[in-house]
A protein has these predicted regions:
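Helix-breaking motifs and short loop linkers at transmembrane-helix boundaries and internal kinks
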Residues: 47, 79, 100-105, 134, ...
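Intracellular juxtamembrane helix-capping segments at the cytosolic ends
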Residues: 120-133, 321-335
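A late C-terminal transmembrane helix in Major Facilitator Superfamily
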Residues: 334-372, 379
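Conserved MFS/SLC helix-loop-helix module at the cytosolic interface between two early adjacent transmembrane helices
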Residues: 66-105
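Helix-to-loop junctions at the C-terminal end of transmembrane segments
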Residues: 67-79, 268-281
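Cytoplasmic helix-loop-helix junction between adjacent transmembrane helices
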Residues: 110-147
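Helix-loop-helix hairpin linking two adjacent transmembrane segments in secondary transporters
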Residues: 135-136, 143-194
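Extracytoplasmic gate region of multi-pass secondary transporters
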Residues: 35-36, 217-269
Length: 401
């Protein structure tokens, strides 16, 4: 399909669609990011240990992966517009349920539902972006990933204060409000002609020869790249605040440090969206981002308190750039927006299942060693491996089918 001939939204409709994409993105991480700063309260109230508590991050991330692998039949049945809407509603309902079902079982169940909702949006929204903005795809994806990081930053910064005002369960449940608001904005914005999906029968039957991604080694190579890059994000999202609380910092301080780091991630996302068009070879920006993240992880081990602010800045800039770059790298491999959406679902499916293991492994290390330093060091090795794999994706190389 020639994307240049696809219907382009008017300026007003395009801005509204970008606003809707941004609003949806803001809701993809708060249900997880708000947990870390409140983890000691949650553990005290429910009796959870570190391994069980890690499931509040591990399960949503794993469900994102499982949901992504199932997204093609869901898209055939629901369509992109309804699928994204369902995702936002599920996130809202899961957050709201935490005000009522605040025991261990209820929190774990809500984590699963959050993961399904996030999976729907993360697999389908980029397809809409690529169709509606074919010539500005990298820029709009930068806006999208900036929204993801921004939502996490706000959730981390406000968690402790909200918990003091309405309790930890209420602080988690309040994130239902922006999720439902995003659903309303999406209902309006997704009516733009360029946001409409192609005929579902065409999707089901296929309009061009396809080779299953599981038969293409290049597609498999993208899975650990996204998985390891996302592992760094999920690891710090889950365990950075408890790491600082364990070292004697207050809950509010730990939350603000996570917020500062995610604020740096927002800045990185903005920079990627502004400048990625100048780098058709994604390897250079990726290597720079990994280097920043490695220095930040080293700082967490060596100088976590005395140099906390620069450590958060470096870590956030690195991880915040790695995340959108991995998505853009994957979407670069196929021109057709529907087929590229299928690729992203495949890559996110395996990648997020890999990423779900990092918070769980860190919880195990914390229970056994009462320290998370080893988790940061292992993550650093993972990022080095990811960077080496990225080097094989040179511009002009063979694309996927």
């Amino acid at each position: 399909m020639d994307q240049s001939n696809a219907p382009q939204p008017s300026r007003g409709a395009g801005l509204l669609l970008i606003a809707a994409i941004f609003a949806l993105a803001l809701n993809l991480r708060p249900a997880m990011a708000a947990v870390g700063p409140l983890l000691d309260l949650i553990e005290a109230a429910t009796g959870m240990g570190s391994i069980t508590a890690s499931l509040l991050t591990t399960l949503p991330v794993a469900m994102i992966g499982v949901g992504a692998l199932s997204i093609r039949p869901l898209r055939r049945r629901l369509g992109e517009r309804k699928g994204v809407l369902l995702g936002a509603v599920l996130i809202g309902l899961a957050c709201l349920a935490r005000a009522v079902f605040d025991g261990t079982a209820g929190l774990i169940a809500s984590a699963v539902v959050v993961g399904v909702g996030v999976a729907l949006i993360q697999a389908l929204a980029p397809v809409v972006v690529k169709r509606a903005f074919p010539t500005r795809f990298g820029t709009v994806m930068g806006v999208y990933t900036t929204g993801i990081m921004g939502g996490a930053a706000v959730a981390a910064a406000t968690a402790a204060g909200l918990a003091e005002a309405v309790g930890w369960a209420g602080a988690l449940a309040l994130w239902a409000v922006p999720a439902f608001l995003a659903a309303v904005v999406w209902i309006v914005a997704s009516r733009a002609p360029a946001a409409e999906e192609p005929n579902r029968a065409a999707i089901a039957e296929g309009t061009h020869p396809e080779v299953p991604f599981w038969k293409q080694p290049r597609a498999w190579a993208l899975v650990p790249i996204l998985g390891l890059g996302t592992s760094a994000y999920t690891l710090v999202l889950a365990w950075l605040p408890p790491y600082y609380v364990d070292m004697g910092q207050t809950r509010a301080t730990a939350g603000f440090l996570l917020s500062g780091m995610t604020g740096a991630e927002v800045l990185a996302g903005v920079l990627v969206s502004l400048f990625i068009a100048r780098f058709p070879d994604r390897r250079g920006p990726m290597l720079m981002a990994v280097a920043l993240a490695l220095v930040g992880l080293a700082g967490l081990v060596l100088t976590p308190v005395s140099l906390a602010v620069p450590v958060m800045l470096l870590l956030g800039l690195g991880i915040g750039a790695v995340f959108p770059l991995t998505l853009i790298l994957a979407m670069d491999q196929i021109d057709d927006p529907v087929r590229s959406g299928d690729l992203l679902a495949f890559v996110q499916g395996g990648g997020y299942i890999i990423a779900s293991l990092s918070p769980l492994a860190a919880g195990l290390l914390r229970d056994r060693l009462s320290d998370l330093s080893q988790a940061w060091m292992l993550m650093g090795l993972g990022l080095v491996a990811m960077a080496l794999m990225t080097l094989t994706f040179r511009p002009g190389g063979a694309k996927l089918r």
